[in-house]
């Protein structure tokens, strides 16, 4: 399997679990509070690593207790942290509410993620992956690093509207949901993976639609990151895009059956069993 390089965010997820999501101005009583490693970039890196990919991560943490915890978590999944920097800003935090039906609301406090820099090229990289939770220069630098060595360049253009559509169009593959693809308009890369939640995903413009795998959903927070990590792991194996997407969908179907993001990412034997 080829190497996957991920340039992205890393946060401490602070998740509160509630019966339902609150209305504006409403106070609800929650059932439990969980601290867990998160951040779109780190989540996707962990998802790929647990599927057997050789992963190198580029990001920035604060010089604080959360930073120590998150660095140790990434190292525990065998991820190369040679591109992980420290800065004086606090480590990023995501405040998450999760309802009993699995739906969620998320507020991200970027902190040190606003200091992520353009990554250095890696001659062994087969796939580069980035997202919209880091500065524009880091996203542009990820594309440049991929182009320098002929690697595939993949962008998860989330959250919506954070990246110029013209920049997204220069990547080989974009992973977007229905809101994010609307924000891009007609500026699309050659291949777009359109995620459709419980309906699965579709390869735009001319690829197949693939159904979601059956799952007992309890928390959808990490579903998109699981899909992205599974997808790039498949691409690093040399799979065609549709086959890589199937791997991503299987990864997501297992993730939503567990609480949290990184702790919920499945192993390769689990994903292979789901696909069998």
Regions found by a protein language model. Give the residues of each.
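Glycine-rich phosphate/adenosyl-contacting loop at the front of the ribokinase-like
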Residues: 1-58, 67-68, 261
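Hydrophobic anchor at the start of a short beta-strand
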Residues: 4, 54-55, 81-82, 153, ...
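Anion (oxyanion) recognition and catalysis
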Residues: 49, 75, 144-148
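Short gly/ser/thr-rich secondary-structure transition/capping motifs
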Residues: 78, 110-116, 153-160, 210-212
